[in-house]
């Protein structure tokens, strides 16, 4: 049985709510249902354009959840200030483009290295763990290690869009390299029941972040049932 943790991203609950600019579905209620059905932590992405999650959502979740909050943000001064006020268990730094539908790829840690040094140091000052969302690439992992990041999250989008052995091998290689460099390894983006079960089998990956697929499934089956089924899919993967 796999002990890989499941992080449920609830951004698109807010997307549905914001479609009519109302106060339902309540994001805290949905998060708590996910937790009661096996979610080990809750993830939200506070984007600069606030297209789904709003500032108030983040504070409400932090004050209400009985599991850790993983806050995804772009590495900007505004977002740093918010993260310090919220004090989530973990901040995951992601790249952002205004016109993208979703995060399109990993953070270029090497390119942003000089800026990220002080950014990560400040988060660590407030005992906030730092994860960097990156492509499954050993050079990016090396840079993350130099920055003293606690974890990386491997972008699985390319594998999910093109489920070849070559793409899977990149994830496997990167996860093993994380172990060698003594940096935590998570994975996420584009995962469904089948691909999550496969990625959960990869040695040294300790957590998966899954959002859009689960929210879509919840329209048909409810958030509790969908999270429970995902938890079972992950647990079915052998250690």
Swiss-Prot record:
Molecular-function GO term, any one: pyridoxine 5'-phosphate synthase activity
Pathway it works in: Cofactor biosynthesis; pyridoxine 5'-phosphate biosynthesis; pyridoxine 5'-phosphate from D-erythrose 4-phosphate: step 5/5
Q: Which Gene3D superfamilies does UniProt cross-reference here?
A: Aldolase class I (3.20.20.70)
- Gene Ontology cellular component? cytosol
Report the Pfam families cross-referenced here. Answer: PdxJ
Which parts of the sequence bind 1-deoxy-D-xylulose 5-phosphate?
A: 11-12, 47, 52, 102
Q: Where in the cell is it found?
A: Cytoplasm
Record key words, sorted? Cytoplasm, Pyridoxine biosynthesis, Transferase
Q: Which cysteines are joined by disulfide bonds?
A: none
- One GO BP annotation here? pyridoxine biosynthetic process
PANTHER family attached to this UniProt entry:
PYRIDOXINE 5'-PHOSPHATE SYNTHASE
Please explain the role this protein plays, according to its UniProt record.
Answer: Catalyzes the complicated ring closure reaction between the two acyclic compounds 1-deoxy-D-xylulose-5-phosphate (DXP) and 3-amino-2-oxopropyl phosphate (1-amino-acetone-3-phosphate or AAP) to form pyridoxine 5'-phosphate (PNP) and inorganic phosphate.
The name of this protein is Pyridoxine 5'-phosphate synthase
- Can you name the source organism? Ehrlichia chaffeensis (strain ATCC CRL-10679 / Arkansas)
Gene field: pdxJ
């Amino acid at each position: 049985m796999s002990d890989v943790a499941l992080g449920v991203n609830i951004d698109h609950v807010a997307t549905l709510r914001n479609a009519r600019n109302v106060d339902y579905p309540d994001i805290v209620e949905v998060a708590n249902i996910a937790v009661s059905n096996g979610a080990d932590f809750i993830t939200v992405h506070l984007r600069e354009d606030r297209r789904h999650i709003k500032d108030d959502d983040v504070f409400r979740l932090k004050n209400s959840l009985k599991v850790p909050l993983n806050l995804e943000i772009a590495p900007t001064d505004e977002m740093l200030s918010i993260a310090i006020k919220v004090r989530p268990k973990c901040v995951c730094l992601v790249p952002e483009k205004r016109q993208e539908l979703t995060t399109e790829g990993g953070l270029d840690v090497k390119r942003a290295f000089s800026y990220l040094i002080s950014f990560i140091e400040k988060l660590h000052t407030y005992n906030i763990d730092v994860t960097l969302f990156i492509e499954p690439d050993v050079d990016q992992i090396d840079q993350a290690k130099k920055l003293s990041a606690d974890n990386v999250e491997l972008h699985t989008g390319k594998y999910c869009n093109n489920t070849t052995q070559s793409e899977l091998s990149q994830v496997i290689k990167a996860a093993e390299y994380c172990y060698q460099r003594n940096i935590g390894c998570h994975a996420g983006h584009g995962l469904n029941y089948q691909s999550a079960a496969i990625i959960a089998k990869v040695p040294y990956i300790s957590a998966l972040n899954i959002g859009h697929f689960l929210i879509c499934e919840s329209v048909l089956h409810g958030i509790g049932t969908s999270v429970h089924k995902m938890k079972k899919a992950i647990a079915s993967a052998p250690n």
